[in-house]
Amino acid sequence: MKASETLIVIGREFGSGGRALGRELSKRLSVPFYDKELLHQAAKQFGISLPEFERNDERKPSVLRSMVESAFGMCPANSSNVNSDTLYALQSCVIEKLARQGGAVFVGRTADYVLRNNPRLLSIFVHCDEEGRARRIVKRGDCKTQEEALDMARRNDRLRQSYYNFYTGRQWGNAANYHLCIDLGKLGLQTAVDIVLHATFDLAQRIK
């Protein structure tokens, strides 16, 4: 297998730099990068308004509902009232479809779980100390102060954790659920990129 055929999936704490790592890996391997682009692709493919996906992006349903049977065939075009479970199923369908097209970098959206049985998967969780996360959040203009940034980071982490745990039955951020866990604040972006690339090339050599 070629390294460029690897499916790199990045889970991340809010503000940890996981998206920046994903973009850099995408460039170095010359493979597509999918983050919020997944929502656009899913909305376009299934004829559902983009705001529906954005409202439910990495957010657990407010009430427990069982997955909709035959979800891919039951979604009315341009629906304004599609439930979270159906949207999750459709998004997962898009992730699987994109994975069949070749190597890629996916950020979030439980893609590590969706692709868990794919031998080309390399799953990563990125974390960082709170001070570093706050600095990054302020620098990119999401907040004006570090206090606001920390509040935003913690709030978004809670949302991501509940979403991931709800749909996967796994524990978000638990090292046992990932192939690599990286402290981006300690290692820095370039070192992290080198580590992941090394793992990617090693995985490619071992898969016939």
Regions found by a protein language model. Name each.
Residues A3-I8, R12, G102:
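Pre-Walker A (Motif I) flank of P-loop NTPase domains
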Residues I10-S26:
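Glycine-rich phosphate-binding P-loop
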Residues P32-A43:
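Short beta-strand-centered segment that lines the nucleotide-binding/catalytic pocket of NTP-utilizing
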Residues A43-G103:
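ATP-dependent small-molecule kinase phosphotransfer cores
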Residues V63-V68, K144-Q190:
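Small-molecule kinase domains that catalyze NTP-dependent phosphoryl transfer to phosphate-bearing small molecules
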Residues S92, L189-L197:
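Short, amphipathic alpha-helical "lid/cap" segments that border enzyme active or binding sites
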Residues S92-G141:
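ATP-dependent NMP and nucleoside kinases share a basic, alpha-helical "lid"
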Residues A204-K208:
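C-terminal helical "lid" subdomain and adjoining coupling/linker elements of P-loop NTPases
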